[in-house]
Amino acid sequence: MDMMQFQRQTTQLAMTQRMQESLRILQMSNADLADYLTAQALENPCLEVRVPEGASVAPALPSRGIQAGLDRDAFATVEGQPPSLLAHVEAQIDLAFFDPGDRRTALAFAEALEPSGWLGQPVSEVAAAAEVEEEEALVILERLQALEPAGLFARSLAECLALQLEDLGLLTWELRTMLDHLPLLAEGRIADLARRCDCEPEHIRENLALIRSLSPKPGEAFAADRTPIQPPDVRVLRGPEGWEVELTRAQLPRIRVSEAGDTGDRQADAWLARARSQARWLERAVERRQATLLRTAVCLVRHQADFLDQGPRALRPLSMEEVALELDLHPSTISRATATRLIETPRGLIPLRAFFSRSVSSDGPEAPQSQDALMALVREIIAREDRTKPFSDDAIVKQAKLAGAVLARRTVTKYRETLGIPSSYDRKRAAAAA
């Protein structure tokens, strides 16, 4: 290998490492970024970092859960601290499981959760504890895996990641194949994976970036001691001309690059030059992080302003791909920018990803609607029914039409079952028994 080729490969390797580091920085919370930069400053005399002293933390609220029956109108500022993982899950179970037997089994699964959010016991053991058949327990588990945050109740890392990708509407055959071969990913065997997926290695690398943006332990967003994990990175306020988005700069570490002069020692000066170059790169990487996060949040708020004004019924269909296209970024960049982040709103703290919502084709000539909004509507209609005369699915279709939503009966049935709401017959029987 000649010197020119060696230098070219060395430069490419350095660029790849910096790209990976830049992606890591993008995904860090403000607190993680402060820790990271502080550690870098200890090793780099040209990097000065000022970390703000403890700032106030806004009260946290449950994460996105319309699909599991959690009404986002409940996102209102509350006193106190965020719930533990168990409390968060139990709150969703109370809303999603009407049948007492199903709820008992669901709570048994909740008790088996590890702090990571993974299921800590075999399904057979949970079924035995709940005194139900294993097949019945598996049905309940599938419903629990639709709760938020996505990835809870997984039995393996691959399943945890697959649940998150499915929730985002991004789970392709290629990604599923990659998750089925995680050891190859860990070993960096890109070529082998490309052959198995019948695609180019570059496509594997793009998918790998998306996988790395996911949370392997979604339960860690909650604390057993009920203390906030992290403050919001972004806030949205109502201004004179509409909603205004800003970064929570009180939480942001400040960087300064020292321009110390030469020492007169060739080796020392060369080392200082490299340190100064690294410090400047870190400064630019943090600036890019802030700009990407702010642009993404502004785009989300612009598209979902009605959600902030009116609540979950006003959510519009919006995907990561649409936002990425609008901002001229890769979807994996949007995924990283929004992963685990909270935005402070007049409704309280909300996961930034709550602003995404899957599109559902209308059963009529109307434009596609948000699945979350339609499911919220179905739940709202059922919540206000006369318990002794519950609405049938056909009646819900008529009520939805009065609210301006065109739904087929089969769609109502699907949403009702996803929400864990029994049929009108079973609801009437339960009301009579009560």
Curated annotation (Swiss-Prot):
Keywords attached to this entry: DNA-binding, DNA-directed RNA polymerase, Nitrogen fixation, Nucleotidyltransferase, Sigma factor, Transcription, Transcription regulation, Transferase
Coiled-coil regions listed in the entry: none
Short name of any one Pfam family annotated for the protein: Sigma54_CBD
Motif (RPON box): 408-416
Function: Sigma factors are initiation factors that promote the attachment of RNA polymerase to specific initiation sites and are then released. This sigma factor is responsible for the expression of the nitrogen fixation genes. The open complex (sigma-54 and core RNA polymerase) serves as the receptor for receipt of the melting signal from the remotely bound activator protein NifA for the expression of the nitrogen fixation proteins.
Family per record: Belongs to the sigma-54 factor family.
Protein name: RNA polymerase sigma-54 factor
Organism whose genome encodes this protein: Cereibacter sphaeroides (Rhodobacter sphaeroides)
Originating gene: rpoN
